[in-house]
From Swiss-Prot:
One of its GO terms (cellular component) is cytosol. A motif ('KMSKS' region) lies at residues 266-270. The gene is cysS. A motif ('HIGH' region) lies at residues 31-41. It comes from Pelobacter propionicus (strain DSM 2379 / NBRC 103807 / OttBd1). This is Cysteine--tRNA ligase.
Length: 493
């Protein structure tokens, strides 16, 4: 199955055919660095990180460009409030962004350009637009003339006349059309500025991305991504600028991730339901947040709530618990790298063997269907269930069963590398989650282990009543015991 991508421009899933065979160019709009990133930023960046990883996994040489908008009204306002230079603000929050993304396990893009490093390219594109009649200078500002570009608004499917008729646009005598947008803003007293043919000033937001994407990916490239909120006006304006300047298609596949709601409501500072990544990671493990994001299709809205985060953590615990059990069974054993041909397997082993044989093809089938990470995780959970059944049935390991367990670990490492998941040592990850949960409980891990040991001794002595009492006591405290041939483990419910 060929990779198909939902293209906002066509409204359909289009087969991915890169501009240059074997290569893929992708540009994703980065953050405006004036504050800490919120969970909406987490979703966008995790989504396109997985797309970047999967393209590479599929054999493409990927050039991934994700920019920083490091000059903007919001940055200037923040600098004025704090009485510092705008670069102090931008550098502070670029560093904070990088820290947040590292905690979420993101791979570094190929290039991370900053707008202020590309003023020459920005000015050059604006000059071209003026020369071609698509832009005009007005009192030190430069505006894009939207009526000069007949296909304006084709990405969002809007109608310019309808927008003008229903718009509440502030009258601006410097504009020929109320919908015209700024390419260059003349400088104001006390604001940072750069020299240009139209006087000192700074670029508009939209032209920055056009210039930076052209520099690193060319006049036409494969994939442009961002949140749905960027379709209009940002991406619409990027198309108008870039195609008018270059006379060719700008982007072949437009991708947009869905919104993040908070307890079924739109995230908003005014509603008091605005959460930064840092605030969320004070309560939840970074991999749990990543798993939560990937548990839904990237185009669907997701509802951020404690219940849904706890459900995501429980799902991730199921996978890590399975992998920890596999590690325990293989510990100290000579594990064959290849299946042992002709060796007998118990019924659950035959089922597991069958699941593993098709796992990669089914994983790829899900990911090739517009990067359906929710379906891909479903394939992995099937393998977890089959592995757990096999582990419950198996006694002493044989070369054939050990080879099967080794295959489980290799396949989860392979798929996990694509998703940016399962990167921790399973036992250590589970222990850290237990510790975080137990910090909020009335019973310590040491006390739990003592009771488990007492229960084991009681069962050895055939005192099953006492064993059941201990199990029920722990259950009342939210501790669930899990018995297996390898011993007894526990989870916090």
């Amino acid at each position: 199955m060929a990779l198909r991508i939902y293209n906002t421009l066509t409204g359909e899933k289009d087969t991915f055919v890169p501009l240059h065979p074997g290569k893929a160019g992708m540009y994703v709009c980065g953050v405006t660095v004036y504050d800490y990133c919120h969970i909406g930023h987490a979703r966008a960046n995790v989504v396109f990180d997985v797309i970047y990883r999967y393209l590479g996994y599929s054999g493409y040489a990927v050039t991934y460009v994700r920019n920083f908008t490091d000059i903007d009204d919001k940055i200037i306002n923040r600098a004025n409030q704090e009485g510092v230079d705008y670069t102090t603000i931008s550098e502070r929050y670029i560093e904070a962004f990088n820290q947040d993304m590292a905690r979420l396990g993101l791979a570094k893009p190929t290039v991370e350009p900053k707008a202020t490093d590309h003023m020459g390219g920005i000015i050059s594109v604006i000059e071209t637009l003026i020369a071609k009649g698509h832009a005009y200078e007005s009192d030190g500002d430069v505006y894009y003339a939207v009526e000069s570009f007949p296909s304006y608004l084709r990405l969002s499917g809007r109608n310019l006349e309808d927008m003008l008729a229903g718009a509440r646009v502030e009258v601006d005598d410097r504009k020929r059309n109320p919908m015209d947008f700024a390419l260059w803003k003349g400088s104001k007293p006390g604001e940072p500025s750069w020299d240009s043919p139209w006087g000192a000033g700074r670029p508009g937001w939209h032209i920055e991305c056009s210039a930076m994407s052209m520099e690193y990916l060319g006049k036409t490239f494969d994939i442009h991504g961002g949140g749905k909120d960027l379709v209009f006006p940002h991406h619409e304006n990027e198309i108008a600028q870039s195609e008018a300047a270059n006379g060719c298609q700008f982007v072949r596949y437009w991708m947009h991730n869905g919104f993040v709601n908070i307890n079924s409501e739109k995230m908003s500072k005014s509603l008091g339901n605005f959460f930064t990544i840092r605030e969320v990671l004070e309560q939840y493990d970074p991999e749990t947040l990543r798993f939560f994001i990937l548990s839904a299709h990237y185009r669907s809205p997701i509802d951020f709530s404690d219940q849904n985060l706890n459900d995501a953590q429980a799902g991730l615990e199921r996978i890590y618990s399975c992998l920890a059990a596999v590690d325990g069974a293989m510990e100290g054993q000579d594990v064959p790298n290849q299946p042992v041909e002709g060796a007998p397997l118990p019924p659950a082993g035959a089922e597991l063997h069958e699941k593993l044989q098709s796992l990669i093809s089914r994983f790829r089938e899900a990911m090739d269907d517009d990067f359906n990470t929710a379906q891909a995780l479903g394939v992995l959970f099937e393998a977890v269930r089959a592995t757990n059944r096999f582990m419950a049935e198996s006694g002493d390991q044989t070369p054939a069963t050990l080879a099967l367990l080794g295959q489980v670990r290799r396949l989860f490492a392979e798929t996990g590398d694509v998703l940016g998941l399962f990167t921790s040592q399973p036992a250590a990850w589970l222990e850290s989650i237990k510790q975080a949960k137990s910090d909020q409980m009335e019973i310590s891990p040491q006390e739990i282990e003592q009771l488990i040991a007492e229960r084991a001794a009681a069962r050895t002595n055939r005192d099953f009543k006492r064993g059941d009492e201990i199990r029920d006591l722990l259950l009342q405290k939210g501790i669930q015991l899990l018995d297996s041939p390898q011993g007894t483990t526990w989870n916090i419910r």
